[in-house]
């Protein structure tokens, strides 16, 4: 049942998701494409986690955070992709109010966690390159755990702000969401609350997270660049660049799409463009991250070669 009478209002108990397209042929094609992307994402990120766990040479803070980033990428994609794949095969794509709440919270939680982890990894690179003699002290196991716990707490608090924005919304009629998942912006557009006040907590917290994490990343890489330019050894420069370029590529891809969604004025792009960009950072980027880190990082490539050689000759 999609509606429930409540006094003078008709409460919505489920939502209908528009998805990406109504074309039945295109839906089958997209199902195959996104299924392949999801399988590559899960296998690639789980392989990254396993490689870091079994390779003693990767037991460093940078790869400790990278393994958690890989876990987040699997979780990020899994909040959206399975439901999206099912919807491609259904004539009418629905999600319950509770399911929508869970998807909204989960997406905000892992998305925020990714921001904090990327910022933490930038700080780790800053300490490693700019203060190498203090690295073992400033990035001790205890400090790494504290940074990780802080990231999870930050993710939980920001996701909670999304619920504070979502729960006051009244849905008294239409229940068709112009999106492939439960995203806050189209839900607010669908609401009959008639006020922009509910979106304030989520907007404020999201802006705070983006400003803080981008500032940490920008300041860290400014000092890193200055330090690298002062290096006299060409080999030292190349090693420093090799450990930073993969992370910087991941940061650029992720924050580029997040900025498009949350910073650019809504009037500058359509809802369909919003959906395409959202697919990129929730589905495509999590698949690309393990590829970026394996292709651009010499330590990852070296560890992978050693593990493969060990398997072949064992």
UniProtKB/Swiss-Prot annotation:
Residues 1-28, 79-102, 158-199, 262-274 are extracellular. It is found in: Cell membrane. It is a multi-pass membrane protein. The chain crosses the membrane at residues 29-49, 58-78, 103-123, 137-157, 200-220, 241-261, 275-295. Glycans are attached at residue 8. PROSITE patterns: G_PROTEIN_RECEP_F1_1 (PS00237), G_PROTEIN_RECEP_F1_2 (PS50262). Keywords: Cell membrane, Disulfide bond, G-protein coupled receptor, Glycoprotein, Membrane, Olfaction, Receptor, Sensory transduction, Transducer, Transmembrane, Transmembrane helix. InterPro entries: GPCR_Rhodpsn, GPCR_Rhodpsn_7TM, Olfact_rcpt. GO terms for biological process: G protein-coupled receptor signaling pathway; sensory perception of smell. One of its GO terms (molecular function) is G protein-coupled receptor activity. Residues 50-57, 124-136, 221-240, 296-314 are cytoplasmic. GO terms for cellular component: membrane; plasma membrane. Disulfide bonds join 100-192. Potential odorant receptor. Belongs to the G-protein coupled receptor 1 family. This is Olfactory receptor 5P51.
């Amino acid at each position: 049942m999609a509606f429930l009478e409540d006094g003078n209002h008709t409460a919505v108990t489920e939502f209908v998701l528009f998805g990406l397209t109504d074309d039945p042929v295109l839906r089958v094609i997209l199902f195959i494409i996104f299924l392949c992307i999801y399988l590559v994402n899960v296998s690639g990120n789980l392989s990254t986690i396993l490689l870091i766990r079994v390779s003693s040479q990767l037991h460093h803070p940078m790869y400790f955070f990278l393994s958690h980033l890989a876990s987040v990428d699997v979780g990020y994609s899994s909040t959206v992709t399975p439901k999206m794949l099912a919807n491609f095969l259904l004539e009418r794509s629905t999600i319950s109010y509770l399911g929508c709440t869970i998807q909204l919270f989960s997406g905000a939680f892992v998305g925020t966690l990714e921001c904090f982890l990327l910022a933490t990894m930038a700080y780790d690179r800053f300490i490693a390159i700019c203060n190498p003699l203090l690295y073992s002290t400033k990035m001790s196991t205890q400090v790494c755990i504290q940074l990780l716990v802080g990231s999870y707490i930050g993710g939980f608090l920001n996701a909670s702000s999304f619920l504070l924005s979502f729960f006051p919304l009244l849905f008294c009629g239409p229940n068709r969401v112009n999106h492939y998942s439960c995203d806050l912006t189209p839900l607010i557009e669908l609401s009959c609350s008639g006020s922009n006040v509910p979106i304030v907590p989520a907007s404020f917290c999201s802006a705070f997270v983006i400003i803080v994490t981008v500032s940490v990343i920008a300041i860290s890489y400014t000092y890193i660049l200055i330090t690298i330019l002062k290096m006299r050894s060409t080999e030292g420069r190349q090693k420093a660049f090799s450990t930073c370029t993969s992370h910087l590529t991941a940061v650029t891809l992720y924050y580029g799409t997040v900025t498009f969604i949350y910073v650019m004025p809504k009037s500058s792009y359509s809802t369909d463009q919003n959906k395409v960009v959202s697919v990129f950072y929730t589905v495509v980027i999590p698949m690309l991250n393990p590829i970026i880190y394996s292709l651009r990082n010499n330590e990852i490539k070296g560890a992978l070669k050693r593990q493969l050689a060990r398997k072949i000759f064992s």
